[in-house]
Amino acid sequence: MAYESFRPEILAKELMVGRGRDCVFKNLTYKGPILGEITKKGDVLHIAGVGRPTVRDYIPGEDITLEQKASHNQDLYITEAKYVNVEVDRVDKAQAQGEVFGVEVREAKKALAQTLDEYIAGFHTQAGNTIENTNCTSATILSTLAEAEQALLEADVPFEEERFLVISPAIYTKLVLGKIVFQQGNADVFGKGFKGSYLNFGVYVSNSIKRTGDVHHCMAFTRQAIALAEQIPASMIERYKPEKTFADAFKVLHLYGGTVIRPAELIRVDLTTAEETAI
């Protein structure tokens, strides 16, 4: 995109497309209907259809109970408002015929996507179950991942439900050293960070995984576990000329929020790496 052809509506779309190339966690979130509009921080959206009805015993001759369900099951609050404010030097812009602006847009897009993924990774604190391995090596990691799969099965996750395992690069190395064989898929289809399938998990690697000291807070979860809503309103994108400088600039506001809608389908996998005794 050339700076001269700047249009807020076009830039808003450009910053939001291609999330599969820029994010890991964002592509693994709930895909069902989320009702409402995002215009500012503090907006409330409604997640529809994530609850399950109650099954009751039928007794002939007695009235049956009508379960009253709200039009939505859970609220989602827009809690995050992140911005970038980028200067584009007019001399550089002229020399590069607008390409400098295109580079700045791409870098802004990547930076916003990275911040978004780090936000979603923080939901490990709301997991319904935690599995620990304080001596994670290539020899012990398989049993830990099997426990994570077991936890999801015990949460009544259907076999056909999409389930994901997101790990840090250090933990992925343990899988490689353990000679774990992944069922390969098309990374262009599955998105950024995809390494293959194992134990019914789509395995992804992300630098957004949170750490506490030497503990890597990896996450095993289903598509139904985490919901996210985001927007970059065209009204919150501006091109302007800063004072006291020969430069142009643009600023962008990214609004989003998320929530855990099925804690039982989110497993926190705390892994502390240990030295390998044999490779």
Model-flagged regions — what are they?
Residues 90-157, 268-279:
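Alpha-helical scaffold segments that mediate packing/assembly in large oligomeric complexes
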Residues 2-19, 24-26, 34, 38-43, ...:
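Signature of extracytoplasmic/envelope-associated structural regions
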Residues 1-74, 266-273, 277:
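N-terminal "assembly arms/tails" that initiate or stabilize quaternary assembly
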Residues 239-279:
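Extended, compositionally biased alpha-helical segments that mediate assembly or anchoring
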Residues 41-49, 146, 153-236:
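Extended oligomerization regions of viral-like shell subunits
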Residues 41-46, 52, 64-66, 72-96, ...:
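Structured, hydrophobic secondary-structure cores that serve as assembly/anchoring elements
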Residues 55, 94, 173, 211, ...:
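Residue-level signal for secondary-structure boundary sites
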